[in-house]
Regions:
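C-terminal helix-and-tail extensions that cap enzymatic domains
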Residues: 1-129
C-alpha cells in the first residue's frame, strides 16, 4: 500500500494511466499469526488458488485481470455486476477488495495514511529503504 502511494510521483509528468487496488482479504492463518494481509496476497486468487476467504472474490479479480489482458482495460470484460475500476487520478481512489464480495468498490485514500506515506518517502533514503 505504501509503495503504491509513494510511486505516484513518476506519473505526475507522464501520460500513463495509473490504477490502484487494495486486496484487504485477511485469511485465518495470517489473522492468527498477526501477519495481516501480505504483499501480493491476491495473486493466488487471480491464478486459481487462494483460501476459503478469497474464493468468493476470485471471479471478480480474475475478471479485471483477464479483461486487462484481452483489451488493455480492466473494465471491458470485467465480471457482470462488478464495479468499474477507475483511474487513480486526482481523486486518489482505488479499487478495494474487503472480505465481503458485495462490498468491492472504489474508496479514497485516507488523508492520514497519505501523510504518513509522504513522510516515509522523505525519510526513506535516510533510513536506507
Amino acid at each position: 500500500m505504501l509503495a503504491g502511494i509513494i510511486s505516484k510521483s513518476p506519473t505526475l509528468h507522464a501520460s500513463a494511466v495509473l490504477m490502484r487496488t487494495r486486496w484487504d482479504v485477511l485469511n485465518n492463518d495470517n489473522e492468527k499469526s498477526g501477519f495481516g494481509v501480505t504483499h501480493v496476497a491476491e495473486v493466488a486468487s487471480i491464478w486459481g488458488g487462494g483460501t476459503a476467504q478469497e474464493h468468493p472474490l476470485a471471479p471478480i479479480i480474475e475478471g479485471y485481470w483477464t479483461s486487462f489482458i484481452r483489451s488493455k482495460d480492466p473494465n471491458t470484460y470485467r465480471k457482470s455486476g462488478s464495479p468499474e475500476w477507475k483511474v487513480w487520478g486526482t481523486t486518489k481512489s482505488r479499487l478495494h477488495f474487503p472480505n465481503d464480495p458485495t462490498k468491492v468498490g472504489m474508496v479514497n485514500i485516507d488523508p492520514g495514511q497519505e501523510t504518513r506515506c509522504d513522510y516515509y518517502s522523505v525519510i526513506g533514503n535516510i533510513v536506507g529503504n
